[in-house]
Amino acid sequence: MSGGYLLDTNIALFAAAAPEMLSRAVRNALKNGPNVLSVIAFWEVVLKSSKGKLDVGDPLEWWENSLNDLAATSLPFRPAHVAAIRGLANIHQDPFDRALIAQAMVEGFTLLTSDELIPKYASARFRVIG
């Protein structure tokens, strides 16, 4: 798999609730696709929802609606993704973002994010649009 756009959790959340918060570059990428949502984003939403830090209603319904609304496919978290985390610099301590970075590297995706730390990882191994 390669050549698509992997959405950071914040992009998936903004796309549904406040698309005006997204940069023009991100909005254009979302229109052009193909778009991919990682189960890592779903996991992050479930955990934040269960702690009362995020209200998306039913997280499973949010996930299914997000896949549909963004015309996105679901990306599982595989052993190759886990292994790629080991080689990442310690720039970012967020385990969800580190997992998404690893997935972008392994799969050849461009990562869509508004996180200011993630572009510091960008290299010839993956691209970032923010």
Language-model features and meaning:
Residues 11-12, 81, 100, 117-118:
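Alpha-helix capping/helix-boundary segments
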Residues 1-38, 52-65, 107, 116, ...:
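Short, well-structured N-terminal submotif of metal-dependent ribonuclease cores
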Residues 8-10, 45, 85, 104:
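Generic structural signal for small/hydrophobic residues in well-ordered secondary structure
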Residues 39, 84-87, 98, 103:
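Residue-level recognition of specific faces of alpha-helices
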Residues 101-130:
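Acidic, PIN/NYN-like endoribonuclease modules and their adjacent C-terminal/linker elements
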Residues 60-90:
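Acidic catalytic patch
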